[in-house]
Amino acid sequence: MAQSRSLLLSIAVNALLVGVLLYSVAVNRTQEGSLQLSAVRGKIAAPRTSFQNAVSRVSRNQLPSSSRKAVAQAFLSNPDMVPDMGKRKLMNNLVLAAVAPVVASAGGCYLYYFYPPQTGGGGGAVGALDALGNPVSAESWFKSHKKNARDLVQGIKGDPTYLIVNDDGSTLNSYGLNAICTHLGCVVPWDAASNKFKCPCHGSQYAPDGHVVRGPAPRPLQLAHVEDDNGKILLSPWTETDFRTGEKPWWA
């Protein structure tokens, strides 16, 4: 799940970069068109003055009728005097049309990454999922996990979260522990032999309740509420006081 979310974020960033590039092309073409139009207008000015002088002479009957007609046709048929702005506008519209879906898809990936689809009830609760994305039932969990067992499910926002089986072997602890190390984000495995969570990346260690017993981790593991709702395991955000520190949760 974490890898797929990282991939989605990478796609979103790349798509946004493509969108910015295409938009820059459209803007540059528009500015280029404005500069070319100004240049064309400058070119038009001199012929137009010549034409006006010619018309003035024509009006004074200084040219024969055949010459008057030739002057008018020469001016009106000169293609350099009329810039083809229709094609330029069409190209700009096509570029902008290409940018729109790219930006929209990038925004969709961004929203999916930071607000992934969740299962579960109201109040911010989500259903625990196994590694394949299937809902985890309390019955199946207790069949495969003994008392004091700590094992991972996909929890809030897809984060790996430890469920803790109580001493009776048939109920879950009222809180779960987010398995992401508070140092640099590695997933911290549970070491039953030492009764600690031990980070394999930089050596941080956590007690069974998730508080730090050895750095460099600066903060305890994040808590989540755990509830058995008629056999369905639900997790919800922990926003009240952190019972391990007596303070407001650092993640809230």
UniProtKB/Swiss-Prot annotation:
Additional note from the record: This protein is 1 of 2 subunits of the cytochrome b6-f complex that are encoded in the nucleus. The Rieske iron-sulfur protein is a high potential 2Fe-2S protein.
The organism of origin for this protein = Bigelowiella natans (Pedinomonas minutissima)
Keyword DNA damage present in the record's keywords: the answer is no
Annotated GO MF terms: 2 iron, 2 sulfur cluster binding; metal ion binding; plastoquinol--plastocyanin reductase activity
Cofactor(s) the record lists: [2Fe-2S] cluster
Query: Recorded E.C. number(s)?
Result: 7.1.1.6
Give the cofactor note: Binds 1 [2Fe-2S] cluster per subunit.
**Entry's localization field:** Plastid, Chloroplast thylakoid membrane
Q: Where are the transmembrane segments?
A: 94-114
Q: What is the phylogenetic placement of the source species in the record? A: Eukaryota, Sar, Rhizaria, Cercozoa, Chlorarachniophyceae
Q: Which Gene3D superfamilies match?
A: Rieske [2Fe-2S] iron-sulphur domain, Single helix bin
Q: Which gene encodes it?
A: petC
Any idea what this protein is called? Cytochrome b6-f complex iron-sulfur subunit, chloroplastic
According to its UniProt record, which reaction does this protein catalyse?
A: 2 oxidized [plastocyanin] + a plastoquinol + 2 H(+)(in) = 2 reduced [plastocyanin] + a plastoquinone + 4 H(+)(out)
Q: What is known about what this protein does?
A: Component of the cytochrome b6-f complex, which mediates electron transfer between photosystem II (PSII) and photosystem I (PSI), cyclic electron flow around PSI, and state transitions.
Q: Which PANTHER family match?
A: CYTOCHROME B-C1 COMPLEX SUBUNIT RIESKE, MITOCHONDRIAL (PTHR10134)
* Residue ranges occupied by any Rieske domain in the UniProt entry: 141-235
